[in-house]
Amino acid sequence: MTDSKSSYTQEWRMAAYLEAEWSDFLFGSSKIDDTSFDPLVSHVHPSFYQEIASLTKQCLEEKGILPQRYLDIGGSTGRTVYEMYHCLSSLNEIVLVEPSSKFCEWSRKLLLKSDDLGYVPVVCTPQKPDYAKPLNRPKPLQKSPAELIYIYEAFAESVPRPREYFDLITCLNVLDRHPNPKSLIQILHNLLTPSGVVVFASPMDSDDTYTPDRSQWISNLNSLFEDRFWDAVADTNVFYEFRYSNRKFTRFSSQVVVKQKR
């Protein structure tokens, strides 16, 4: 997975993720419909993360679960954690793991610090991003060194917590960047408490770079979760948008499943 890690160091990719996850804060973007979208001036909106948080809260309430220990695998620059923090008041420990050092650096800046962000990379040409001062930034989730939020540069296989530790895990749009999807599901199962909940999403945009064994490519997330180990809670689809350059806009449809460990 070293190649996967190194590919997430380029500044153009950083610009794309910052926009996809934080454009409402950094650039003041609002959700717009397709008819008014202009890729030269418009930003994609992070509605994906807000919809995931809303779905998670609804499912947990229906199950009568008040999660305390929460893990986000492949947490990128931290928007999922931000939404869960504000959505789930019962949380008392949050762990984000992300293999990219650059993404971890930005998640710490955006989630834990109140410093000026300086110039941030902005989506521009395929060769390189532009740079601009953001209009705003999110308020930090903690203002003191309270031991609530931990951010680790790590893969899912190296989460520094014991088995059956977390009662809520999110793993969003990571599957098609993992060499062995079935082993990833086993990792989630090991880390979850009995009756713990996982929110798992993927557009299943697999390719040979990240998952060279094509027998591991899937078309439905439910095929990874065996009924003898998991109960189905929800199954839906949520749009996930990216702007890789100012003329390359991509919309994925991520399948989102919510499962409860038996």
In which residue ranges do the predicted regions lie?
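S-adenosyl-L-methionine
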Residues: 112-157
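Conserved class I S-adenosyl-L-methionine
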Residues: 67-76
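Conserved SAM-binding loop of SAM-dependent methyltransferases across substrates and taxa
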Residues: 77-89
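Conserved SAM/SAH-binding beta-strand->alpha-helix loop
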Residues: 100
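A short acidic, Gly/Pro-enriched loop at the edge of an enzyme's catalytic core
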Residues: 157-169
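Conserved alpha-helix/loop element of class I SAM-dependent methyltransferases that forms part
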Residues: 43-66
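Conserved beta-strand signature within the Rossmann-like core of class I S-adenosyl-L-methionine
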Residues: 195-203
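A short glycine-rich, Lys/Arg-flanked "PGG" loop and its adjoining helix->strand segment in the class I
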Residues: 182-194
